[in-house]
Amino acid sequence: AIGGWLVSVCYFALNLAAAATAAFALVERTGLTATTPVKVVVIVAIAALTLAISVYGHGLIIRLYLPITLALAGAFAVVGFAVLRHADFSYAPAEPLTGVDLWAVLVAGTTLIASGPLSYTTSADFSRYLPRTAPAKAVAGWTALGAFVPSVVVSSLGALAATAVDMTDPQNALQKILPGWFVPVFLIALVLGTVSLNALTAYSAGLALQAVGFRISRTVSVLFDGAAAVALTLYGLLVSHFLDTVSNALQVIVVLIGPLTAVYATDILLRRNRYDGVALTNETPGSPFWFTGGVNVPGAVALLGGVAAAALCVNTLYTGPVAGALGGMDLSLPAGMTVSAILYVSLGRRAVAATAR
């Protein structure tokens, strides 16, 4: 729960920063100057709108997200059409990557993309509303397909756009190939999209904080998460360079969520997905899941071991010794997940057997 909360708050901050950046551009288009006080007000206002949706929870989210999805799909279609019109389909880099450099870029890109879906692993806050009769394969299949198709389409359009404009600053770059009348709509769509995404993230973060054991209402937990995310966003936008912050954060987050996911998935496999739901939600020392002082020691050791292994392989904010020895190749994701899975299988069998259903 702690790991899930940390990941959710980090993504809340990153998404909020993206929405705020688009909102700053909207403010500038009105003739106002986006001074630091104005930026702070914009960030807080977007966070307040997001948290209002999260506080009301699942019911409001379900009602709002169909019309939001349709509106965003329309905006995305216009952007996609503009990208296809301007893309250079004959583009070839001046110096194609080969050998170790090619693999280093491929692994870094995979790690960056994987950070998104992996971050949702411990946030099954909507699947819990599905009936028990829902086929597990169907749930997994449709979830994977729903994540895979948009990722491929969006990533492909991003790559095509990079053949026409400098995508180191995607928001400003795309405005150069969009019709002038559509630019404000594009910016509003960016804000709306990130607000809708963050409402889900804040909802999950609030539940994760409650799952840690704090006796607070979901409203209080969501507001606390929002305050933490706003603080991180202010740092990312007003102190650090935004794109560097996003890139580094997404890749460093993998150091945590890779091992976290591995422990979670390995536990599911060892138990064959059979859990005593009542006992699992019992947070008292009498619960079979209380383990040692409330800590599953094998799980904690496996997590820390995986994080340590991943940290040695990082090549983002710093270059770990393993990454350095491999010519800059970042293997933090596979290394962290593999080490955590092996450690948990080796150390956790007794704990799993003691709490088996």
Describe each model-derived feature in a short phrase:
Residues A1, R29-Y56, L70-F81, I113-T121, ...:
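Transmembrane alpha-helical segments of multi-pass small-molecule transport proteins
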Residues A20-F24, R29, A71-E95, I113-P117, ...:
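Hydrophobic alpha-helical segments and their helix-loop junctions in multi-pass secondary transporters
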Residues A1-L32, T194-A211:
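Hydrophobic transmembrane alpha-helices that form the core helical bundles
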Residues G80-H86, E95-A161, G180-A199, F291-A310:
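Hydrophobic, membrane-embedded alpha-helices of multi-pass small-molecule transporters
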Residues V153-N198, R215, L234-V255:
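TM-loop-TM module centered on a large, flexible mid-protein loop between adjacent transmembrane helices
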Residues T21, A25-T30, A45-I68, D125-R132, ...:
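Membrane-water interface regions at transmembrane-helix termini and the short interhelical loops
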Residues A71, L260-L343:
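C-terminal membrane-solvent junction of multi-pass transporters and transport-like membrane proteins
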Residues Y56-P67, T121-V149, M167-A173, T201-T219, ...:
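Hydrophobic, small-residue-rich membrane helices and short re-entrant helix-turn-helix hairpins
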